[in-house]
Amino acid sequence: PEGKKGEKGTTGNEGPPGAIHPGETLPSSATETGAWIVSTHDEGAIAQSFSFPIPLTKAIESTNEHFIKHGEPSTEECPGTVENPEAKAGQFCVYAEELLAGMVFASFGSNYKSGTIATFVATENSPGGFGLNAYGTWAVTAE
């Protein structure tokens, strides 16, 4: 048989809040990073979205979006590498590990507080039955 229940104890202290609560944005100078991949077969172009887990307070300016091709040196705005992506405050940096032959980065498109979109296209000398394949990492830092 079960014994008599004891009195309820006192409630402990509430722990500290998490870093981000729903509705909050990425704090100033904080950085988010991620990985990306794009792949298709026999398409002339393909779009890739880059979603930021924690939204920014404002969308990245189009002049602050950068694409660093495999083998290119880092820049002042994007001092990182594909293995260690970095972005200076207010910058969005995409690092490509590989762009297969017949594929080029075209442009960044629509910008939102929660991400941006990029387009990749096949080059004129892409062989029949080609595939567009690329992958790498990205970083965004809030202003």
Locate predicted features.
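Short, low-complexity N-terminal tether/leader segments at secretion or assembly junctions of large
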Residues: 1-4
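Extracellular receptor-binding modules and their adjoining Ser/Thr/Gly/Asp/Asn-rich linkers
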Residues: 7-143
